[in-house]
UniProtKB/Swiss-Prot annotation:
SUPFAM superfamilies: Phosphoenolpyruvate/pyruvate domain. It comes from Edwardsiella ictaluri (strain 93-146). GO terms for molecular function: magnesium ion binding; phosphoenolpyruvate carboxylase activity. PANTHER family: PHOSPHOENOLPYRUVATE CARBOXYLASE (PTHR30523:SF6). The keyword Transcription does not apply. Forms oxaloacetate, a four-carbon dicarboxylic acid source for the tricarboxylic acid cycle. Belongs to the PEPCase type 1 family. It is an enzyme of class 4 (lyase). InterPro entries: PEP_COase, PEP_COase_bac/pln-type, PEP_COase_Lys_AS, PEPCASE_His_AS, Pyrv/PenolPyrv_kinase-like_dom. NCBIfam families: PRK00009.1. One of its GO terms (biological process) is tricarboxylic acid cycle. This is Phosphoenolpyruvate carboxylase.
Length: 877
């Protein structure tokens, strides 16, 4: 174990020393000594030395206002560097990658040992569909400019990881590392302004350009090699099991800053970036494909008189890409150029000339050339294509209801909003079947309603394939889905866009089966969807509504029911998982999360959100992206070919009890305890989080209101900061404890050993408890909370201790994370640096709340501690 982590610890130590040298150069020996003293005290405190803990508290409480910011920045920046070292460890030949066998090779070996029919495996590979939806949730706290520097630090670590480096080469790399660490130190880590939705969209496109553009073809090459080695089967050229969609620029749910015009601009920007990236690819191909021998098919395309037919075809495509770039550039500047005759609007325009070159090279005995850069480009065409990433539109159901109500009132038909569900459906289906338009040409709607109609107009004008789906948040009835279909029809949408209901509260999840059964019984609807249905399961809001245990069971049961309903109706169901990065929002290691899904729920593929900082941790580097995509692929193939058994009725009964008990306790605190909201507001930096310019979306659905109006992300962000992690465990451990008291211990232990769903739930609770810290949570209370509310904090911390014991009993282990030593090592490594930031944050919150005049140093240092704790916890919300 120690050997495996020695390389990572060595990198962490080296980066820490470089940061120390930078601080000394910038601020002098005295500040560096202060930082080192705090680090040593923190390390000793973590080892259980009570005197060191008290000294740590005294030292941080007595920092002058001028010392606050440098100390906060030192520990925050160290955690960023430690995260880079840990991320590199995942892909290093001397790290985790070396000790873990290839996930796909391991899976194919197991499948063979299970005597699975090769045709069955091949069919599962052919049907493989992974769609990752990049979202702009405001959990990526690091600035893009710092992320670029950290990516280059990773590159330097990779370069140093070679035994054959000459001394001067090693010296040059170390010099570059010093420069990067110094650049980071002298860069403000906190944004001054909130990013706009277009800034967020550009960040998403940068992930594609800097990582996925290389990462996806590299993953497909590795996947193909494993298929050849294990099955003697090659991945077809046109098979691309991975696709990417974005919510940046399309998700307007609760975000008034995402307008129809913003979506139109995001669509243009993504097409512009795609054209630019494909132009680079084609330029390389023009220089590489100088061959003269070709098929008659390519000769006919290139013309009879050219000596270099491949180059001739590719030069035309290059010109087409240049023309497309010029046109899109003008559109983005607000100019109206005539549309070029050869404007690229469909993937087929890219695919055909490239694939003709590919077929010619293969037919003429040049397969080795065809399967190089050209194959990578062809796979990019299928994965990214002309849109680069497709965009989802998301809007709340009530916005559509209000828009239609305004229209029906204008037309003298009554108030749609007040109609019964039956009357709404009758009206919607009549209009969907009508050949005449419903919206009068000269009607002037309110700005809110105009925005809904304008969005549908943007969808109608977008090239087919640029928009992936229209997601309806807070969908509760069949009319919520039919209403969007009518709005799109009225906009003249020329293609059948998937309209996706999102079920996200406990009641909505429990009602999902009834809603979809009713929808699929409607003849018009069945005819329109042509045998395919997508449904989104919301993890964040259901967990905030009912607690993680009740929410996870409701999500599982809803998925089972939806699979059953669609199977009975002969409909192919794709479940869209709206998971967050944190446990309280459905986050879990991808492999475990997928294997814990109900049997049959992944047979039409996987669609899942990748949120905020998790995009950087899982997809931010080409090698990391390859690793993440490999894990997704192996997990989906395993879930479909070796599905877990359906849970026994006895297990279901126990889960029903756990769900009811945990939900009741969770809601008793959150909704019924009058002390809870004041305690939450004072014990966490919830109010101060609103000052952080994290994302373009407001933190609350309504400016006034309590916990219920808070979005799931800031709700979890706040509890993560004070280390109580409450949303990720409240209610769950108590329910387990009560179930054991009632004689279910043996059943729970059996469930943990034999049911992946339950195993993942318990493992995730272990992870949360390992990241939580009760002495720090208590310190926040003592420093910030009215003593009259202290009993509530004490009660919650005692609850955590009992919950930990319940989890350890069921897992039959003496300490947390016994089966996940890598994660335990990672948490332990960062705690030494996160603890001082937590103590400092509590001190800064105290000063900030008690000062008569705002102090810029205090405010800035507080923001830095929030960013630093987020880095230390490896997730925000």
């Amino acid at each position: 174990m120690n050997e495996q982590y020695s390389a990572m610890r060595g990198n962490v130590s080296m980066l820490g020393k470089l940061l120390g040298d930078t601080i000394k150069d910038a601020l002098g020996e005295e500040i560096l000594d202060r930082v080192e003293t705090i680090r040593r005290l923190s390390k000793s405190s973590r080892a259980g030395n009570e005197a060191s803990r008290q000294a740590l508290l005294n030292t941080l409480q007595n920092l002058s206002n001028d010392e606050l910011l440098p100390v906060a920045r030192a520990f925050s920046q160290f955690l960023n560097l430690a995260n880079v070292a840990e991320q590199y460890h995942r892909i290093s030949p001397h790290g985790e990658a070396a000790s873990n066998p290839d996930a796909l090779y391991h899976l194919f070996t197991r499948l063979k040992n299970k005597n699975l029919d090769e045709a069955q495996i091949r069919q599962a590979v052919d049907n493989l569909s992974i769609e990752l939806v990049l979202t702009a949730h405001p959990t990526e706290i690091a600035r893009r400019t710092l992320i670029h520097k950290l990516v280059e630090v990773n590159t330097c670590l990779s370069q140093l990881d070679h035994d054959d480096l000459a001394d001067y080469e090693r010296h040059q790399i170390m010099r570059r590392l010093r420069q990067l660490v110094a650049q980071s130190w002298h860069t403000d880590e906190i944004r001054k302004n909130r990013p706009t939705p277009i800034d967020e969209a550009k960040w998403g496109y940068a992930v594609v350009e800097n990582s996925l553009w290389e990462g996806v073809p590299a993953f497909l090459r590795e996947f193909n090699e494993q298929l050849e080695k294990s099955l003697g089967y090659q991945l077809p050229v046109e098979a691309v099991p991975v696709r990417f969609t974005a919510w940046m620029g399309g998700d307007r749910d609760g975000n008034p800053n995402v307008t129809a015009e913003v979506t139109r601009r995001a669509l243009l920007l993504s097409r512009w970036k795609a054209a630019e990236l494909f132009l680079r690819d084609v330029q390389v191909l023009v220089s590489e494909l100088s061959m003269t021998v070709c098929t008659p098919e390519l000769r006919a395309l290139a013309g009879e008189h050219t000596q270099e037919p491949y180059r001739e075809v590719l030069k035309r495509l290059r010109q087409q890409l240049n023309n497309t770039l010029t046109y899109l550039d003008a559109r983005l500047r607000g100019e109206r150029l005539p549309r070029p005759a050869d404007l690229l609007v469909s993937n087929d325009q890219l695919w055909q000339p490239l694939h003709t070159c590919y077929r010619s090279l293969k037919a003429c005995g040049m397969g080795i050339i065809a399967n190089g850069q050209l194959l990578d480009t062809l796979r990019r065409v299928h994965c990214f294509g002309v849109p680069l990433v497709r965009i989802d539109i998301r809007q709340e159901s009530t916005r559509h209801t209000e828009a239609l109500a305004e229209l029906t009132r204008y037309l003298g038909l009554g108030d749609y909003e007040t109609w019964s569900e039956e009357d709404k459906q009758t009206f919607l289906l009549r209009e969907l079947n009508s050949k005449r338009p419903l919206v009068p040409r000269h009607w002037t709607p309110s700005p809110e309603t105009k925005e809904v109609f304008d969005t549908c107009q943007v969808i109608a004008e977008a090239p087919a394939g640029a928009i992936a789906a229209y997601v309806i948040s807070m969908a509760r009835t069949p009319s919520d889905v039919l209403a969007v279909h009518l709005l799109l029809k009225e906009a003249g949408c020329p293609y059948n866009l998937p309209v996706v209901p999102l079920f996200e509260t406990l009641d909505d999840l429990n009602n999902a089966e009834a809603v979809m059964t009713q929808l699929l019984s409607i003849d018009w609807y069945r005819g329109f969807i042509q045998g395919k249905q997508m449904v989104m399961i919301g993890y964040s809001d259901s967990a905030k509504d009912a607690g993680v245990m009740a929410a996870s069971w409701a999500q599982y049961r809803a998925q089972e029911a939806l699979v059953r309903v669609c199977d009975n109706a002969g409909i192919a169901l794709t479940l869209f998982h709206g998971r967050g990065g944190s446990i309280g929002r459905g986050g879990a290691p991808a492999h475990d999360a997928l294997l814990s899904q109900p049997p049959g729920s992944l047979k039409s593929g996987l669609r899942v959100t990748e949120q905020g900082e998790m995009i950087r941790f899982k997809l931010g580097l080409p090698e990391i992206a390859v690793s993440s995509l490999t894990l997704y692929t192996s997990a989906i193939l395993e879930a479909n070919l070796l599905p877990p058994p359906a849970p026994k009725q006895e297990w279901r009964d126990v889960m029903d009890e756990l769900s009811q008990t945990s939900c009741a306790l969770y809601r008793r605190y959150i909704r019924k305890n009058p002390d809870f909201v004041p305690y939450f507001r004072s014990a966490t930096p919830e109010l101060e989080l609103g000052k952080l310019p994290l994302g373009s979306r407001p933190a609350k659905r309504r400016p006034s209101g309590g916990v219920e109006s808070l979005r799931a992300i800031p709700w979890i962000f706040a509890w993560t900061q004070n280390r109580l992690m409450l949303p990720a465990w409240l209610g769950a451990g108590t329910a387990l404890e009560e179930a054991m008291t009632e004689g279910h211990r043996g059943t729970l232990e059996n469930m943990y050993r034999s049911w992946p769903f339950f195993t993942t739930r318990i493992d995730m609770l272990e992870m949360v408890f390992a990241k939580s810290d009760l002495w720090l949570a208590e310190y926040y209370d003592q420093r910030l909370v009215d003593p009259a509310l202290w009993p509530l904090g004490t009660e919650l911390r005692q609850q955590v201790q009992r919950d930990i014991q319940a989890v350890l009993t069921i897992a039959d282990t003496d300490h947390l994370m016994a089966d996940l030593p890598w994660a335990a090592e990672s948490i332990a490594l960062r705690n030494v640096y996160t603890d001082p930031l937590n103590v400092l944050q509590a001190e800064l919150l105290y000063r900030s709340r008690h000062q008569e005049q705002p102090d810029a140093n205090v405010e800035q240092a507080l923001m830095v501690t929030i960013a630093g704790v987020a880095a230390g916890m490896r997730n925000t919300g």
